């Protein structure tokens, strides 16, 4: 901040960006305050760094997976993995008919959440029992609680240990098929 003029945040595009950021933060804090007033909210982690190393079961190559989860919480005794999004989230973005959809390039949001859940599970960082839940918070509009859904998650739309076993198998299968050049 010291390198920029004092007017940098009081006019033009920077002022507009600052005001939009303030609005997003205000909406998020209001949402959080409402949830805390309505139920039991226990924050378990913010910007939690995850990493896991393993050897590919058939290729016998080392693999390292990393990620940063925006927020982990327990709300009314349900463990929730949150991801904050500054852009648009459509219902179809979060619908997953099968784990094979993850590798087609159009299901980045479900892939991200399932990878985070898998990393938490593999590292045994969560003591809360399954099922777990996922959430995405649209910062631009203040619209929360977009959950992963679809046949891949079953009727409950929950993240289960069985789903994470299947995810790991699908991930390893996909990585076996990726060309090495």
Label every model-predicted segment:
Residues 34-40, 74-78, 122-129:
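Secondary-structure transition/capping motifs at alpha-helix termini
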Residues 1-55, 148-163, 175:
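A non-catalytic, helix-rich entry segment at domain boundaries
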Residues 7-8, 75, 91, 146:
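Hydrophobic, well-ordered secondary-structure segments
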Residues 4, 106-108, 115-181:
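Metal-dependent nuclease catalytic regions and adjoining charged, substrate-binding loops involved
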Residues 14, 18-22, 39, 62-65, ...:
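Active-site-proximal structural scaffolding
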Residues 45-123:
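Non-catalytic protein-protein interaction segments used by genome-maintenance enzymes to assemble
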């Amino acid at each position: 901040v010291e390198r920029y003029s004092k007017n940098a945040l009081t006019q033009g595009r920077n002022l507009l960006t600052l005001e939009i950021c303030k609005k997003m933060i205000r909406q998020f804090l209001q949402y959080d305050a409402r949830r805390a007033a309505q139920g039991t909210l226990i924050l378990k982690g913010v910007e939690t760094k995850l990493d896991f190393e393993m050897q590919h079961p058939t290729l016998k190559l080392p693999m390292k997976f990393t990620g940063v989860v925006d927020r982990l919480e327990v709300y009314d005794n349900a463990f929730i993995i949150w991801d904050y999004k500054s852009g648009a989230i459509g219902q179809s973005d979060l619908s997953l008919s099968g784990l094979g959809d993850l590798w087609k390039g159009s299901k980045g949001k479900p892939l991200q959440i399932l990878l985070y859940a898998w990393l938490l599970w593999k590292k045994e960082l969560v003591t809360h029992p399954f099922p777990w839940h996922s959430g995405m918070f649209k910062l631009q509009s203040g619209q929360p609680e977009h959950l992963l859904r679809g046949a891949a998650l079953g009727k409950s739309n929950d993240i289960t240990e069985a789903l994470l076993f299947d995810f790991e198998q699908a991930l390893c299968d996909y990585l076996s098929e990726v060309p090495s050049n």
